[in-house]
Amino acid sequence: MACMLLLAACDNYLDIQPTGSVIPNSLAEYRALLARSYKDVSKFSDRGMACFRSDEMQVRDNEYDQNYYMDIERWNDLAPNAYTSSFEWAKYYNVLFIANHVIESRSDIKEGTEEEINQLVGEAYMLRAYVHFLLVNLYGQPYTKEGALDTKSVPLKLDTDLEKVLKRNTVEEVYTSIQADIDEARKLVMKAEWEQRYSYRFNAASVEAFQSRVSLYKGEWQAAWDAAEAVLAVKSVLVDLNDAAATLPNSYNSVENITPLETPLSLSLIHI
């Protein structure tokens, strides 16, 4: 009996919410949680830095740029300069954790309609697919390269288990997971368009736009075409470049944008 009382007391103690912490329960709280992940994704600039390792960009001959980017350009990963900018792969996995938490909590989300909850979870599937897509293309072989499908790329993270030891998955396994998440998102994301202040969120057109990009990277030309046509059927407006006052496509509020989520180049890279 004493043991039972002790266990009950422990359960009650563990149920206490720590002061100053927020454990999401409502739709609004889960939406705020996902909004933080959207913000993190918007700051990813690793692809911009990766351009130093191709013929797209060259580090300028000044002390500042040399300190931060020269060893990236030279592929010096073993003993880089202490000031060398780092690739932020860990932040990608932070976003994956939040996306997984929203997906796993689908049946526990309160104070929202089924449609609103489905939309939120669908966006989480899209975030998970998109982040895995970025990772596999930064750290894996191109999908269409001969023999690439069986090569190791990045670990898939599909749950919130922090104790699980992750192992690298093959390029094919990562792309299979990406496609599965897109398929789930397609069933859940029904929002046609968000008002401008929420335009960073995924909508139905962005699901098909991402599908087109994934198919393109896989060399599935017809599938890429079909998905692109589905997007153009609902979003085909172009910026009039003859208008001096036109908002260019690189702006988040351009009429061409579908989901203005990311900035592939950070401000520190723009003028290099």
Regions found by a protein language model. Give the residues of each.
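Inward-facing hydrophobic residues that define packing positions of alpha-helical scaffold repeats
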Residues: 96-99, 175, 182, 228, ...
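Conserved, well-structured interaction surfaces
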Residues: 69-139, 169, 187-189
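Membrane-proximal, proline-rich intrinsically disordered regions
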Residues: 10-54
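Short coil/turn linking the two alpha-helices of tandem helical-hairpin repeats
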Residues: 136-143, 193, 219
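Short coil/linker segments at helix-helix boundaries
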Residues: 138-176
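Hydrophobic-face positions in mid-chain alpha helices that act as interaction patches
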Residues: 32, 219, 225-270
